[in-house]
Amino acid sequence: MAGFINLEDSPMFQKQVFSLEGTSDELKDRCQKLYKGVKKFMGALGEASTGVSAFADSLEEFGAGHDDPVSVSIGGPVISKFINTLRELSSYKEFLRSQVEHVLLERLTNFMTVDLQEAKESRRRFDKAVHSYDQAREKFVSLKKNTRGDIVAELEEDLENSKSAFEKSRFNLVNSLMTIEAKKKYEFLESISAIMDSHFKYFKLGYDLLSQLEPYIHQVLTYAQQSKEQSKIEQDRFAQRIQEFRTQSELDSQQASAKADPSDVGGNHVYRAIPRKNVEANSVSTADKEVTKQGYLLKRSASLRADWKRRFFVLDNHGSLYYYRNTGNKSAKSQHYYSGLGEHSSGVFGRFRTRHNRSASQGSLDCNMIDLRTSLIKLDAEDTDLRLCFRIISPQKTYTLQAENGADRMDWVNKITAAITIRLNSHFLQQSPARYLDKKNTSSGPATENLTLNQKEDYNQRLNVGDDVLTILREIPGNNTCAECNAPDPDWASLNLGVLMCIECSGVHRNLGVHISKVRSLTLDVKVWEPTILDLFRNLGNGYCNSVWEELLHHLDDDSEKGSTDTLASVSKPSSEDWFTLKEKYINGKYLEKALVVKDEREANSTASSRIWEAVQSRNIRDIYRLIVKADANIINTKFDDITDLDVYHHHHVDAPDEVKKRHDPNACQRIKNSNEARNCLQGCSLLHVACQSGDPILLELLLQFGADINMRDYHGRTPLHHCIASGNNAFAKVLLRRGARPSIEDGGGLSVLERAMEMGAITDEELFLLLAECQ
């Protein structure tokens, strides 16, 4: 009540009351907005708590709540510890939500429904009392002098009662308004500060909880990173195995095709004269069973329908032939694909399906053995129209089988024939194995036994192409060891960097991206190693390339600059025995950061552009390589305009569009007209244009490997392909077309490459014409 100087009912008093009521109404609006915000905040906290709990439950379902091998392999026991932490954090969020509800929302609701509402009700009662008081006063003052005394006394009493009620309601209204004025000074501050204290406790509890878990989290992250690196290595090795397998399969297919004898198709017994020494070697080579051949064959059923069923056949080195069929409730498509896979593949996914698919069981694969000791193999079938069939005839049953191709059929026939021979001679071989063991090392393998002389030469040429590449490249200085870790006998290479490396370092090079390093195998990617690539590597080699990329290492003894020493201290060359992470760090620093490259800071980019232009014109492969590596900017697409201040006759001040178009037409160029050679006008030409004019295939290959723009246009709109056609260099033109050059680009005269070539006369190179026509 201290805000009211005078408590008498006066206009000043009423003004103060109206002012307080206005403040209360404004406060009510603010409280309603705050109420909505608090409700949303509580809802968000509740959803967050529920979401964290759901996330924890899903993690438990994912694997943390099980002890099966799949759960263990994905880190279920580790995740379970994180789940407990997440649930604890969820309880903290729920605690914070309850604090917001009790400390803020309930008090805010009470303030709105009790205090503010009481002020509203007090105003309503006050207005009613004012009305009653006004009526009583009007009645009393309107009495005449001759009014009876009892009536005067009655109205006077009513007036006094109305005035008393008026005063009471007046002070009740003031009290309720002053209560609001008093509470607003501490109610909201107290509630909101309590909420902030609850937030502090919430985050402190979370921090304490996660601080205890921090060492464990870092330990798991370290383990995961190591597992990731190991997985990369294993994936690279697996990719190499796949490539080797595919290469070997192709060679086996070629070998089987070479062995195919047309005389065998006539129905004669395929009892090929397999040398005894090969049979002996196969029989006594190992005491354990090993798979000689396995794969799918179509088997004709013995039913009246005589339909074909796809079965998985396995032939081992002891002469046993098995086939498998799926007897589970799988669909025909699944049976067609997965028949026998769980037993003879690597087994990971087969075991997973068997364990987790309820419709399958451990006995879903039916295995059958064919006794080869009393069997005979023939290449025909009852239906002579079928080309790829052969039969295994035994006293018990005749098996009619069909392969996917002729080479596969002959491979099966030859290996089953050898298995029959093994079974027939097994008793004899067991009597004196020592004698045959002595002959093992001198026996020739069956792979080329039945090849003609020309077939053997072709086969050996294909087989040794990888060895030839290895021999050529390893004779280059420094190429006998890995360029990154000095591991002996590297069998991988980077095409654009010109270095050889081991398989482990090749994995790091792949991660750099093909714009940094294009990794290829010396033995598997046989089509890559064209003569031009080999010549490029002869010009470079590990020795020279590392003298550029590792120049700081090579000058360690003579370098006295502190900056260089610091760089070497942070990046040291690993050995072949070092961890993968050390090799990765070194290779990244070497090629991504160029940490070991000696750069001349005084040499500007314009100087580097001029020097590389001179090196290209002089065809100095090593200088070009060194300048590209040492340049801070990308100078591979340097133009003639970048090194020369052009103020030549092409720069006329002509505004007419026709004149401008005519000026760009190469036929209108005076220099080209005078010399009849496109090379005499270099305006706008790039390094690749000059390389095409030089006729040096190694120079062209180097620029393409480093990403030179193959479709860059000169002042006359001509691409390097235009220059090759204009100079009659068809070999270079075909190289550019195979590497992505677009012959549809028109020069300044509006003609494409094909049109320019036809303008020069008939195109006698048929391959060039086809390439131009296909890409047009």
Swiss-Prot record:
The keyword Membrane does not apply. Residues 290-421 form the PH domain. Residues 467-604 form the Arf-GAP domain. Pfam families: Ank_2 (PF12796), ArfGap (PF01412), BAR_3 (PF16746), PH (PF00169). One of its GO terms (molecular function) is zinc ion binding. Residues 2-226 form the BAR domain. ANK repeats lie at residues 683-712, 716-745. The keyword Zinc applies. Keywords: ANK repeat, Coiled coil, GTPase activation, Metal-binding, Repeat, Zinc, Zinc-finger. A zinc finger (C4-type) spans 482-505. InterPro entries: ACAP1/2/3-like, AGD1/2/3/4_BAR_plant, AH/BAR_dom_sf, Ankyrin_rpt, Ankyrin_rpt-contain_sf, ARFGAP/RecO, ArfGAP_dom, ArfGAP_dom_sf. Residues 248-267 are annotated as: Disordered. It comes from the Eukaryota. One of its GO terms (cellular component) is cytoplasm. SMART domains: ANK, ArfGap, BAR, PH. Expressed in roots, hypocotyls, cotyledons, leaf and shoot apical meristems and siliques. Probable GTPase-activating protein. This is ADP-ribosylation factor GTPase-activating protein AGD2. It comes from Arabidopsis thaliana (Mouse-ear cress). The gene is AGD2.
